[in-house]
C-alpha cells in the first residue's frame, strides 16, 4: 500500500512538473496588430507621398544653389564661403539617415517620415530669417539632418509597396522627385526671386509641412516592415553581418554623389559667372535640363527591369562622359542648353536606378537604416563637391572645374557598379 501511494504521488508530481511548460509552449504569440497587404490604391498613395516628400526636400535644398551669389553679397562673403553651407548640409545628412533610419526600422516607416518632413520644413523657413552668415550655416546644418532622414525612410516605404516587375520604373519615378524639386526651385527663382528676393524662396520651403497631413490620412504602414518588426538585437546583428555590403554601397554612393552634385550644384553659378547669363536665362536652362533628368530617370529605371541595375547605371555614365564637352563648352546658348539636357538625362538616368538597387541589396531587418546610411555616407564623402569646384574655378574657371570633376567620377562610378553585386527583382520580404 505504501509503495502504491508513493508511486501515485510521484506520478502526480511528474505530471504537474511536465505539464507546466507545455501549457505555455503551445500558446502562439499575439501580434500587436493584424498584418495586411496594401491595396493598389494605398500603394499609389504611398508612392505619391514618397515622391512628393523627396521632391519637396530637393526643392528646399536647391533653392540655395540658385541664390549663392546673392546671399554672399548680403552677408559680405565669397561664393566659396556660401557654397560651404551646401557642404554643411551634405555633411549632416548621415546623422539624419542614422536617426530616422533606426526609428523607421524599429517602429515603422510612417511616423518617422512625418516627423522628418516637419523638421526640414521648419528649418527651411528659419533659414530665410537668418540674420548672419554664422546662423545661416547652423540652420543649413540642421536642415541636413532632415534631408538625410527622408531618403532612406521614403525609399524603403515606396519600394516595399511596388510589385517587383515595376520596381525599376517606380524607382526612377521616385528618384526623379529630386529633379522635379530642382525644377520647382528653378521656377521659384524665375518667378519669385526677381520680385521678393532670396529670403522669400526659403519661406516657400515651409510648404512641405502640409504633406504630413496627407501621409497620416492616406499612407498605411509597410507590409514588409510589419512582417519583420526587428528588435534592437536583430537590427544590430543584421548590421554586423552585412558590414561588407554596407562598405561597398558607401563607396559606390560616394562616386554617384559626386556625379550628381558635381554636375548640378555649381552649374547655375557657372552659367551666371562664366557665361554671363541673367536669372531668367539660368532658370530657363535649369528647367529644361531638369525635364531631361526626369525623362532619364524614368527611361533608365524602366530599362533596368530589362537589362539589370548595374548595366543600366554603367551605360548612362559612360554615355555621359562623351556629353561633357557640349555641356560646358558649347558656344551658343541653344547648344549649351541641349548639352545640359543630355547631361542630366544621363546623370539622373543612372541615379534613377539607385532606390531599387539599394533596396534589393539591403537586409530586410534594417532596410531603412542600411540604405539611408549608405546613401548619406556617400553624400558625406562628396560633401565638398561644390566647395572643391568653387576653389578650382577661382584658378582655372568654372568650365574646367566642372569638366575635371565630371570625367573623373563618371569613370569611377561605372567601374565600381560593375564590380558589385545585383539582386534585380528579388523579394524585399524577410526570407523564412
Residue ranges of model-derived segments:
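Cytoplasmic helix-loop-helix junction between adjacent transmembrane helices
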Residues: 139-176
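Helix-loop-helix hairpin linking two adjacent transmembrane segments in secondary transporters
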Residues: 174-216
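Cytosolic juxtamembrane N-terminal segment immediately preceding the first transmembrane helix
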Residues: 17-18, 22-59
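Helix-breaking motifs and short loop linkers at transmembrane-helix boundaries and internal kinks
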Residues: 76, 108, 129-135, 163, ...
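Conserved MFS/SLC helix-loop-helix module at the cytosolic interface between two early adjacent transmembrane helices
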Residues: 95-131, 307
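C-terminal transmembrane helical hairpin of 12-TM major facilitator-type secondary transporters
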Residues: 304-354
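Extracytoplasmic gate region of multi-pass secondary transporters
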Residues: 65, 244-294
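Extracellular/periplasmic helix-loop-helix junction of adjacent transmembrane segments
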Residues: 65-95, 280
